Amino acid sequence: MACSIVQFCSFQDLQSARDFLFPHLREETPGALKRDPSKTSSWEDDSWGAWEETEPREPEEEGNTSKTQKNSWLQECVLSLSPTSDLMVIAREQKAAFLVRKWKHGDKGKEEMQFAVGWSGSVSAEEGEYVTSALCIPLASQKRSSTGRPDWTCIVVGFTSGYVRFYTEGVLLLAQLLNEDKVLQLKCRTYEIPRHPGVTEQNEELSILYPAAIVTIDGFSLFQSLRACRNQVAKAAASGNENIQPPPLAYKKWGLQDIDTIIDHASVGIMTLSPFDQMKTASNIGGFNAAIKNSPPAMSQYITVGSSPFTGFFYALEGSTQPLLSHVALAVASKLTSALFSAASGWLGWKSKHEEDTVQKQKPKMEPATPLAVRFGLPDSRRHGESICLSPCNTLAAVTDDFGRVILLDVARGIAIRMWKGYRDAQVGWIQIVEDLHERVPEKGGFSPFGNTQGPSRVAQFLVIYAPRRGILEVWNTQQGPRVGAFNVGKHCRLLYPGYKIMGLNNVTSQSWQPQTYQICLVDPVSASVKAVNVPFHLALSDKKSERAKDLHLVKKLSALLRAKSPRPDSFETEIKELILDIKYPATKKQALESILASDRLSFSCLRNVTQTLMDTLKNQELESVDEGLLQFCASKLKLLHLYESVSQLNTLDFHSDTPFSDNDLAVLLRLDDKELLKLRALLEKYKQENTKATVRFSEDADRVLPVKTFLEYLEYEKDALSIRKIGEEECVALGSFFFWKCLHGKSSTEEMCHSLESAGLSPQQLLSLLLSVWLSKEKDILDKPQSVCCLHTMLSLLSKMKVAIDETWDSQSVSPWWQQMRMACIQSENSGAALLSAHVGHSVAAQMSSGATDKKFSQMELDADAEALTDSWEALSLDTEYWKLLLRQLEDCLILQTLLHSKLSPPAAKAPSLQSEPLPRLSVKKLLEGGKGGIADSVAKWIFKQDLSPELLKCANKERDVENPDEPREDLLHLAYEQFPCSLELDVLHAHCCWEYVVQWNKDPEEARFLVRSIEHLKQILNPHVQNGIALMMWNTFLVKRFSAATYLMDKVGKSPKDRLCRRDVGMSDTALTSFLGSCLELLQTSLEADISRDEVQVPVLDTEDAWLSVEGPISIVELALEQKPIHYPLVEHHSVLCSILYASMRFSLKSVKPLALFDSKGKNAFFKDLTSIQLLPSGEMDPNFISVRQQFLLKVVSAAVQAQHSKDKDPSAEAANTHWKDLNWPGLAVDLAHHLQVSDDVIRRHYVGELYSHGADLLGEEAIFQVQDKEVLASQLLVLTGQRLAHALFHTQTKEGMELLARLPPTLCTWLKAMNPQDLQNTGVPIAATAKLVHKVMELLPEKHGQYSLALHLIDAVEAMATL
């Protein structure tokens, strides 16, 4: 109940705004930069704390000035905060930062408000102009649904050039030049409901102070103009048209005279003098000849501070009314018309951009100012005023000067009524507090309207003074009251007092909604926080006889007593009773009792005795003087304390249930046969094994007693009914454990506990909610103690028999809300084992009560022969029974699925990537019902991805067990899931979800190429071509085509296989991953082609759902989306497949001088990367021979590279091991297929393949490949050359004596031909001569006898045979 200062907002990154406005401060922080350069842009990284710790103690040391400058930077800025706390402006010179409000979750789970930089930049449009003042004005909404509430906030900025510009979040709305001098100050006044009928209603206005003039803009005109400009800016941004003329603006302009300098001003508003004051003023100025009118004139009052006079009072007549004095009227009558409301001229062009592009050279026309002389002032030639702050009710004003004084002015009388000294560079503001009628105490024997709770509320004003030199914030009671609060806040803060609220309200809209606006706040740059000052109303009433002050003293004394380190047990309780009984005010007494009950240092008996004593004292008083609210509060707390005592006693009693418990008893209790009970036990045992985790448990946690303080926080009495507050899940578990945990273990009497709770007034529904929260959260302990099921059955039966648990009018053909509450708790629980057990217990109790009710009903009737049949049919037709059966099936399915998802492979194959090590979320029936038809398969697919199971293993797990396959528990669980979900986990559906899951995870980390490879493997396992085609098409469009096109353009640009850096930059993966990616794309396109061929032969599958999950809702499944896909256009997919093969071959073999797109004409290029289901114009007819030649050269390169990679002797074993998935591809065969699509002769490719095989010494493979060649004569000529190269190498490079002799015996023709051969073209020169002889004979077979080289071949045979004998 004392004055306080509370933080209500913080800054997300204030240091970045400081660095933007003060770049030199950022450069002067070498210490912070050396510590961690990456953390210099965030105030959250302890940079402020580091500076505070290193602050020099002696002011003479170096660095103290630098630190002060870094912390006091806010004093040099223009600062403004919107009254609705949604926008803040920090400006300096030509720059400004607009900070917007954001909400984030704090450490305690509550939302915290923060200011973050929403826009920053330069706001100056003319050269050399600086920001001098700024305002954030919230504008009221005009919508019916939000009348009176803030719609948006306008930022008004004044400049040294005289311009006033209006912004909204960085967008310039309009700009106005009203005077050529610089803007000194901007102030705003919004509408306030008059407190008394005689008070003049003030209009809204924006006042702009210049060195010798003051301009006031009418609030209604400004409001309409800003709304129109904002709408036009939005239209201009949408249409691109910026040539829109802003609407006109009405204003008044007064030239202030007879004053030297003006620093600040206050616009008091319209005032009317009383007849006495009117005559007094006329007599003092005009003498006895002064004439006055019958009705006093209305005048606008302005107060300025500066020098000569120190404070000046100006009065401007409103409308055409006569001035107060005749000669004054003569002086201003000729000029009065110029100050009437007129349309503002000279609007500048505005734009919907952050900055203006150009500034118009021509200055707008200036309206002349109407002279306004100072009527009187406070003359003080040595004193210079610095600021003036008007009170909320316009009766007082606080003025600061250069002498360190704060002067309090009476605005109406124009006199100084109080002065404070010792406040140099002070910042002031006001707080207006309205009295709370509920805190009033009736006055004894008085007839004051403020002596009862029905009178009008009083209003108190407090002056807030911030002295930055001393770092202190003080709150003073006005006018002559004492200081009521003082706080040490630091020396670098800024005190913000806007003095206005929301613009655009009137006497009707201002009453529809009370805006949440602050009156005054303190911005602390050191702690990066915004704090509000709270002052209770009663501080305005404090005097020597104040009972309130005495009560506050007693409350402080009580707080100190509760915080005492070593309280005296003997007198502690007595002192507390005396203190609380001495307090007079009921509200303060209630506050004291709340602090006592919230203390965790007092024993339960002390709390009970203190509360009981206060209760007895109140009952002994007279009824008229007793506060009913306090009496009810004490009674409710006593009831809660008695309930706490009774529950604690029941939990401490030595109670043990001697009833034996067996499996047969459990089966009878749950109404299950032996087979069903065994199945339930087996499921729970598997679930328990898979969900076992190594956790540390403390014995005191289970038996920990709920503190009485926490107990009182959780419960409350409302209208004589005990209810549970809105608390979190953990709090519900704690409260439920306090009530039921001992009962569930058989250590406390269940009947007595239920009776105590029911007698206290807790409803059965709340007790059921607590019971289930405990049961479902303590799953591990419950599964270890099966006897707790019996205790739950007993507890649930007792709760169900309470009076308001089950409605007596409930019909079996309708759903019981009682049982529906229990079912909903089981549906939402993620602990499937505990939920399944509780559902069995609930089903059993519901059936028991239903049978009992049926027996009771039929016992009152005459039974006939069919009575038993009627009873059976009654139970069978119960709607709740059907819902229980459905829930049991769903929970059993969820339990099996949960067991599977938490099972782990042992041992782990290898270190799993981070994506595969992420834990899977726990399941609940609700999640499965909201997950759509594919939710179950999607969950299993995530588990398969996490375990990295092969598609073959999924197929094996779906088969029946046989002797050959070993029993593996993980496969057993998967097989059990298949049996439980025959529709949701159908193999095609599961493979489709696995395929999608792998490609989604690959997209998160493209470097994991094996994820995409595994995705394609699952895609190939899908049997239905409709599903296969749809999944492939979705994968291509969603994840692959963008990267595929990027890879194509990159390879075409560089003309070879790109390096790793380029691949990462353009495609987002390494060169190795890109190679694998292209191979996977090729397999996907080929799979799509195969699926399209068999589409017409297979029907579209019908997707079924298990009976228990027919009510599933949620997103459409992957398989359903796949079936909605259109059929592919086969030629277009084939066209992409050709391109993919080219790219894959180029990357696989690192081919150079290859531009993939150069192999296609314009039609072929235009068809790439289009929708695979669309019909595109593809190349047809004869191709240009130049294209064919380039294609043929590429295919020959591929064949050569493939043969070399396969048969080269200098292979890299590590690279070969890393690229094992590339060896399966038949590259020569693929080259032949490509030759068919590229219109290249496939026989040329086959002949080249045979030649490459023989060149590498693979003669056996070459002999097999010869059979596929069509033109064997040309092949024989090519092989003859290769034979000559082998012989030339053997004869000329060995140069043995026998070889030279043989060479001399050869025919001259053959010798000349061998010398012309180049053996360097051979890839393998170590081929045995016998293999070469065999090759010559093969050439002889292929060459016809009439061939020109036939005789040469005969000579070769002789030469080879001769060499074989050497």
Swiss-Prot record:
Compositional bias segments (type: Acidic residues): 43-63
Gene Ontology CC annotations of this record: endoplasmic reticulum
Cell compartment(s), UniProt: Cytoplasm; Endoplasmic reticulum
A Gene Ontology biological process term: positive regulation of protein lipidation
Residue numbers of Phosphothreonine PTMs: T899
InterPro entries, per database record: Rab3GAP2, RAB3GAP2_C, RAB3GAP_N
Region (Disordered): 30-69
Primary site of residence: cytoplasm
Assigned protein family: Belongs to the Rab3-GAP regulatory subunit family.
Function statement: Regulatory subunit of the Rab3 GTPase-activating (Rab3GAP) complex composed of RAB3GAP1 and RAB3GAP2, which has GTPase-activating protein (GAP) activity towards various Rab3 subfamily members (RAB3A, RAB3B, RAB3C and RAB3D), RAB5A and RAB43, and guanine nucleotide exchange factor (GEF) activity towards RAB18. As part of the Rab3GAP complex, acts as a GAP for Rab3 proteins by converting active RAB3-GTP to the inactive form RAB3-GDP. Rab3 proteins are involved in regulated exocytosis of neurotransmitters and hormones.
Subunit and interaction comment: The Rab3 GTPase-activating complex is a heterodimer composed of Rab3gap1 and Rab3gap2. The Rab3 GTPase-activating complex interacts with DMXL2. Interacts with LMAN1.
Protein name: Rab3 GTPase-activating protein non-catalytic subunit
Organism of origin: Mus musculus (Mouse)
